[in-house]
Amino acid sequence: MTEISLIAFDADDTLWGSQTYFNTVEKVYCEILAPYASADEVSHTLRATEKANIPLLGYGSKAFMLSLIENAVKISHGKVKGYDIGQIVEVSKELLRLPGHPFDGVKATLAKLHDTGRYRMIVFTKGELLDQENKFQRSGLRPYFDDIVIVSDKTPDAYKRLCKQFGVKAKQLLAVGDSYSEDIAPVLKIGGWAIHIPDYMDNEDRSYLNKIHPHLIRLSRFAELTNFLSPNSRLIDESKLS
């Protein structure tokens, strides 16, 4: 048995949907830019533009919007019309109004964990501060959490700072998230625990599904999370890992 004191939940595509909305915006974006390039070419160059902008813009809806505009100018060789740029801006703004509607089973599971009084529960997410705070507020999940921590990127050092902030050792931290590279791998690297709930809408390499680690639990649904937390203590039931 392993004692867990702090549970850090990812937000987008773990507590509520996000990637599907970005995919919808990108589809409309490709239609707007159809006079200049194929949808595949637009998406390919957009990925490259986003990646190049991460060091300066970081992650989130606003960073995505700026990359959409920059890529539109680039792929059209400066010929994109002002009206089309306006359309891109308007459709992108919809990402700033996402409802943050919790996935099935999320609210009930969080309520069950919260009501035990045995864990400190936080949202640990990356992205633009105001955007993430607004989604969190609209989600209706605030009563179940002690805090929300928003960082520019999720790295081993970011998880170490999180442990220091809340006064816990890495082995007392449990991270829950959909992205192996962002939510899972960094916390495993510092000796923490992780519950991976894969999101098949993401763009990650699927090879992570074959990874095995003694501190890694992989689930198919959020509601299964409580199966691995002992009902009468702050422990992970390791007997259920096999």
Regions found by a protein language model. Give the residues of each.
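An amphipathic alpha-helix signature
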Residues: 22-30, 65, 69, 129
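A short, Lys/Arg-enriched amphipathic alpha-helix followed by its capping loop at the start of a domain
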Residues: 28, 32, 36, 109-118
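Active-site neighborhood of HAD-like aspartate-dependent phosphohydrolases
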Residues: 1-45
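Asp-based, Mg2+/Mn2+-dependent phosphohydrolase catalytic module
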Residues: 1-4, 107, 111, 115, ...
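A metal-dependent, Asp-based hydrolase signature
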Residues: 49-94
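Long amphipathic N-terminal alpha/beta scaffold segment
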Residues: 88-108
